Amino acid sequence: MALLSHCTSADRRFEQFTSRVFREEMTASTLNMHYTIADPAAFGITDYEPVLPLYTSGQSDASGERCSALLRQLSCIAYDKLSPENAFTYTLLQRSLENDLALAQFPYYNEPLSPSSGMQSQLPILLAEYTFRSRRDVTDYLALLDQVDDYFASLLLYEQEKAAAGFLMPDVSLEKVQKQCDTIVPIQELAQGTHFLQTTFEDRLVELQAQGILSAEVVSSFLKENDRLLTTVVQPAYATLSEGLYS
């Protein structure tokens, strides 16, 4: 009975630990959370702020320190007393944290603005495919739009630090990224209301209205706010990023 009690205790501690780590990871990026889980409340995530993850100077050091802290906490859990399923998860988590810790020593090897799959081109796609299941999803989405300028500014800071460290991307790649920034959110399409971030947004709102989740008045209000944010936040953010890459 004592052995069974110890096993249960170890499993409980491990599951509490992994649940906490999961919640921290999810609430650090609303985009990641939304594409990972449909119902955050089912995972104990009920009070969160919609955020895009911003890069800050020294972030790699902080990330390494967090990985080290999590590995220390993980090591305090008796691996040999875990269930087979939890033991397997333990091994995977430990390996992942160790890899992240090793990568933290190479802070400028990432390329978030890659010409082929950088966030300048991926973010609009993620936004266009952002599923609306509730009114909260819509308000989260609009809050994320309102942070695109800060998000791109943080990526530009990262690129500037990379350049100072001798890791600036080649000129041909910079030119491709700049061209993408100049063409992804054209002012003309926004003025005409034909940009895909306008049309897909309206389509999703119409579905919520058909389900009785949103009224016509609320839909109209959300459409106006989306247009405002695309025009005053998102489009200028792309222009600023394009200019900053060559400054």
Regions from the PLM with identified roles:
Residues 4-247:
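N-terminal maturation segment of proteins
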